């Protein structure tokens, strides 16, 4: 039991040291390191709004713009922001993620799956429900639902290829920059300590 306490104390000292060094960075760099997930979340919200617009055009949905637009912006934003914080920002700031390649891979995958593909898949039931409610498009019968949605989604995925790739590259780049800023912060000397 005592060994467990000493490990926690050592880990807490490490987290305190890392946060103290991060606070020594200039404000712009510190903001990028601490709030980078918000930028990825904003890009995901934009992907959600674009996918929503494309599905609305295909399904001829003209009503409930705000009712469909708000969840298509907020849900991808919050999901991407929280996921990026949990799997990239927090492990970087606690010292659990100490490999640049791992950071780039994690942040790129979050950008691709959560920030790019998830908003497009989320737009399908939102706009499908609106099309059924307002009867703006002929929806399939029970037998061919899957083939209908695959056929309907293909042009949307083609048009969303660029925003999804942009989101992936931006997220990977942001992860790389955050890792470099963390390394820069860790190399700063303590203000009260002298190096001999």
From Swiss-Prot:
Domain of life of the source: Eukaryota
GO terms under biological process: mitochondrial protein quality control; mitochondrial respiratory chain complex I assembly; protein insertion into mitochondrial inner membrane from matrix
Transmembrane feature ranges: 35-55, 58-78, 108-128, 160-176
Keywords (A to Z) from UniProt: Membrane, Mitochondrion, Mitochondrion inner membrane, Transmembrane, Transmembrane helix
Keyword rRNA processing: no
Mitochondrial matrix face residues: 1-34, 79-107, 177-196
Record localization: Mitochondrion inner membrane
Gene Ontology cellular component list: mitochondrial inner membrane; mitochondrion
Mitochondrial intermembrane side: 56-57, 129-159
Pfam families found in the cross-reference section: TMEM126
Bilayer topology: Multi-pass membrane protein
Assembly with partners or alone: Interacts with OXA1L; promoting cotranslational quality control in mitochondria.
Family from the record: Belongs to the TMEM126 family.
Purpose of the protein: Protein required for the cotranslational protein quality control in the inner membrane of the mitochondria. Associates with newly synthesized polypeptides and may act as a chaperone that cooperates with OXA1L for the insertion of newly synthesized mitochondrial proteins into the inner membrane. Required for the assembly of the ND4 module of mitochondrial complex I.
Protein name (record): Transmembrane protein 126A
Organism for this UniProt entry: Pongo abelii (Sumatran orangutan)
Gene that produces this protein: TMEM126A
């Amino acid at each position: 039991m005592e060994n467990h306490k000493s490990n926690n104390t050592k880990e807490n000292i490490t987290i305190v040291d890392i946060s103290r060094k991060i606070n020594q960075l200039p404000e712009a760099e510190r903001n990028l390191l601490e709030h980078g997930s918000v930028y990825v979340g904003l890009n995901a919200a934009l992907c959600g709004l674009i996918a929503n617009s494309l599905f609305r055009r295909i399904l001829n949905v003209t009503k409930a713009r705000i009712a469909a637009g708000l969840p298509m912006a907020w849900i991808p934003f919050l999901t991407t922001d929280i996921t990026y914080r949990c799997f990239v920002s927090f492990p970087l700031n606690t010292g659990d993620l100490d490999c640049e390649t791992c950071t780039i891979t994690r942040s790129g995958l979050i950008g691709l799956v959560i920030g790019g593909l998830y908003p497009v898949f989320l737009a399908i039931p939102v706009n499908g429900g609106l099309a059924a409610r307002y009867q703006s498009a002929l929806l399939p019968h029970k037998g061919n639902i899957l083939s209908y949605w695959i056929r309907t989604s293909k042009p949307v995925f083609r048009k969303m290829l660029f925003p999804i790739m942009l989101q992936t590259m931006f997220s990977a780049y942001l992860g790389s920059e955050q890792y470099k800023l963390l390394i820069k912060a860790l190399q700063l000397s303590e203000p009260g300590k002298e190096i001999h």
